[in-house]
C-alpha cells in the first residue's frame, strides 16, 4: 500500500475531519488484510486511543506486524514502547534494536531514541548490539 492509496487517504481525511471511528474502521480492515502501513496506523490508533480504547499492547501488536514489513515509523514506535515499558516489558536492549532499524531507515526520532537508549546500556551490551548490525 502506498501513501496515495485511496483507502488510506480516506482514513487520513476522516482523522482530519474528526471522524476517528471511521478512520479506525478503515485501517482495521486494511490491517487485517496484511497492509503494512495500515497496520502501523492501527497501532497509532490504539496507542493514542483515537477511535478506540487506548491499548498499548494492541499498539505493539500492530506495530510489530508493520515493522516486520519494513515500516520505519512502526519500528520507531516499537523502540519507544520497549524503552518506556508501554505494552511490553521495558527492555532497553530490544528498544535499541528497533530504534537502530528505524534510524537506518531514516527516521529522525529513532536516531534520538537510539542515542538516549545507548546511555542506558552497558559497554558490553553496546558492543554486542553493534556486532548484530
Predicted regions and their residues:
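TPR-adjacent "capping" and linker segments in tetratricopeptide-repeat scaffold/adaptor proteins
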Residues: 1-6, 29, 124
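Hydrophobic face of amphipathic alpha-helices that form TPR/SEL1-like repeat modules
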Residues: 5-10, 41-48, 52, 77-84, ...
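Terminal, low-structured helical/coil segments at or just beyond the last alpha-helical repeat
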Residues: 109-133
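Short, hydrophobic/proline-enriched secondary-structure or compact coil segments at domain edges
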Residues: 92-100
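TPR/TPR-like alpha-solenoid signature
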Residues: 8, 40, 61, 76, ...
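Short helix-capping/linker turns of helical repeat alpha-solenoids
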Residues: 2-3, 18-19, 32-35, 48-50, ...
Amino acid at each position: 500500500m502506498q501513501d496515495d492509496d485511496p483507502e488510506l487517504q480516506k482514513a487520513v481525511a476522516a482523522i482530519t475531519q474528526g471522524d476517528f471511528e471511521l478512520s479506525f474502521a478503515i485501517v482495521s480492515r486494511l490491517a487485517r488484510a496484511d497492509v503494512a502501513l495500515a497496520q502501523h496506523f492501527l497501532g497509532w490508533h490504539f496507542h493514542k486511543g483515537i477511535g478506540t480504547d487506548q491499548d498499548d499492547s494492541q499498539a505493539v501488536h500492530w506495530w510489530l506486524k508493520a515493522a516486520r514489513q519494513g515500516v520505519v515509523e512502526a519500528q520507531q514506535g516499537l523502540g519507544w514502547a520497549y524503552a518506556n515499558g508501554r505494552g511490553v516489558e521495558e527492555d532497553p536492549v530490544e528498544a535499541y534494536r528497533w530504534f537502530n532499524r528505524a534510524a537506518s531507515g531514516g527516521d529522525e526520532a529513532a536516531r534520538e531514541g537510539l542515542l538516549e537508549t545507548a546511555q542506558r546500556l552497558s559497554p558490553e551490551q553496546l558492543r554486542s548490539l553493534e556486532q548484530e548490525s
